[in-house]
Design a protein with these regions (language model features):
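Extended assembly-interface regions of large multimeric machines
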Residues: 1-120, 139-164, 300-314
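Glutamate identity and glutamate-enriched acidic tracts
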Residues: 21, 62, 87-90, 111, ...
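Catalytic cores of large soluble enzymes that bind and process phosphate-bearing ligands
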Residues: 41-44, 57-58, 134, 138, ...
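Extended, beta-strand-rich, solvent-exposed assembly scaffolds of outer structural proteins
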Residues: 48-57, 109-330, 387-393
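General N-terminal targeting signals
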Residues: 63, 69, 288, 330-332
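Extracellular Cys-Trp
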Residues: 80-89, 303-307, 317-403
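Bacterial flagellar/type III secretion structural subunits and associated motility module proteins
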Residues: 94-126, 140-148, 152, 328-367
Length: 403
């Protein structure tokens, strides 16, 4: 006689009685947005579609998503309890200070505001000795006046007497598969580093250097993002290389704007080469060639706008590399009238480097695990979607990823 397998091997039934009015747990959803309105590091909970529309704006993508989310399933016994939303800085994020709402302030009252205003952005104090909004014809016009005043005298951080900038180029470079080779006979100017986009010859659009091989900036091998075969050609790397020399003072750092000589506008230091604050090489954001000259580094200008959704002034760091970006609440006699202090309802969001699912998602869970499913507001790349799925597969079925 063939023996049977006990049913308990497959299922273990635990008898229990549900309360007569039990409705079960609410399965909240988590939405990752690449918009910048949610402060970095915060997970906001919204109880309704209308609350999402109020915070993000009625025409926002977040509001459209929430309208579908809270509609739920027709005739379902239970609808979603809340929608959690957090900012995923896909390409990094600059720091910002958003004031409390002044939407109800009459224009005449706005025009009466004057005084001092100080904001520490990216580690440097921006001071406006005499903000005067008497000529402002709108809230946006007032924002423009504040921006001009805060950027009128930018702190000079570093100086040099003999610095130069060259483009990043190399001759006779080849690519085989995912390996870029800059041979020993190549003429190299500037430096090549991970993160640079390279062009030249038949190189495919969007090809970036992803890592060092034997090369450390010049001759040698590097890995690239797109597999391809390219015969010997001259390549150019994005950005340029700044060499700080001569008599050097102060501390040169990522996020500062380089000025002097024939330097192009908005040239920012985006990486360190051999320079670690003084003489040496640095990577800058704009491709250009500048002959030896007296160059300086100064605090990067801020942007000031009027946010019509929140009805508040928004001060944003101009630093291109989010991780080097920071901001604090404002001070001075005009700060409170402009609602730019913590006491008047202002909020801050600090800068952030580009996020990865492997490090971002654990930080969210550490803050709250009151959600069951998660998705992105944008269409992720295949590699990005796989990275989210890979993280989710290690969570012991706690969450579901909706790609």
């Amino acid at each position: 006689m063939t023996s049977s397998i006990p049913a308990s091997y497959f299922v273990n039934v635990q008898p229990s009685v549900l309360a007569a009015e039990s409705t079960g747990p609410a399965l909240n959803g988590l939405l990752l947005t690449n918009g910048t309105r949610v402060p970095i590091g915060q997970v906001l909970s919204f109880p309704s579609a209308s609350s999402v529309a109020t915070y993000f704006g009625a025409s926002s993508s977040e509001a459209a998503f929430a309208a579908q989310y809270f509609a739920g399933v027709t005739n379902a016994s239970q609808q979603p309890g809340a929608l959690l939303i957090t900012q995923y800085p896909e390409t990094g994020a600059a720091a910002w200070l958003r004031g409390g709402s002044i939407a109800s302030l009459p224009l005449t009252s706005l025009q009466a505001i004057s005084g001092t205003l100080n904001v520490t952005v990216d580690g440097y104090v921006r001071s406006a000795a005499s903000v005067n909004l008497s000529t402002a014809t709108s809230f946006s016009a007032a924002a423009a006046i504040i921006q001009t005043d805060l950027n009128a005298t930018l702190p000079v951080i570093g100086t040099s007497t003999a610095s130069s900038i060259v483009t990043n180029t190399a001759t006779q470079a080849t690519i085989s598969g995912n390996i870029l080779t800059i041979p020993s006979g190549s003429t190299v100017t500037g430096m090549f580093i991970p993160g640079q986009t390279i062009t030249g010859g038949t190189i495919l659009a969007g090809t970036t250097i992803t890592g060092f091989g034997t090369g450390t900036g010049g001759i040698g091998t590097y890995t690239v993002s797109v597999s391809q075969n390219v015969s010997a050609t001259t390549i150019t790397g994005s950005g340029a290389t700044l060499t700080v020399g001569g008599t050097v003072t102060g501390t040169w750092a990522i996020g500062q704007t380089v000025t002097g000589g024939s330097v192009a506008a908005n040239t920012q230091i985006i990486g360190l080469g051999t320079g670690k604050g003084g003489a040496g090489t640095y990577f800058v954001s704009v491709a250009q060639t500048v002959s030896s000259a007296a160059l300086s580094s100064e605090a990067t200008p801020v942007a000031v706008t009027y946010d019509t959704v929140s009805g508040a002034f928004l001060i944003t760091s101009g630093v291109a590399i989010g991780a080097a970006s920071s901001i604090a609440f404002a001070s001075g006699t005009a700060a409170a009238p402009l609602m730019l202090t913590q006491a008047t309802g202002a909020v801050t969001s600090q800068g952030a480097a580009p996020a990865t699912p492997a490090t971002f998602m654990p930080a969210v869970v550490a803050q709250t695990s009151n959600w069951a499913t998660f998705t992105t507001l944008w269409e992720p790349s295949i590699s990005e979607a796989l990275a989210f799925a890979a993280w989710n597969s290690l969570q012991n079925n706690l969450f579901a990823y909706l790609a």
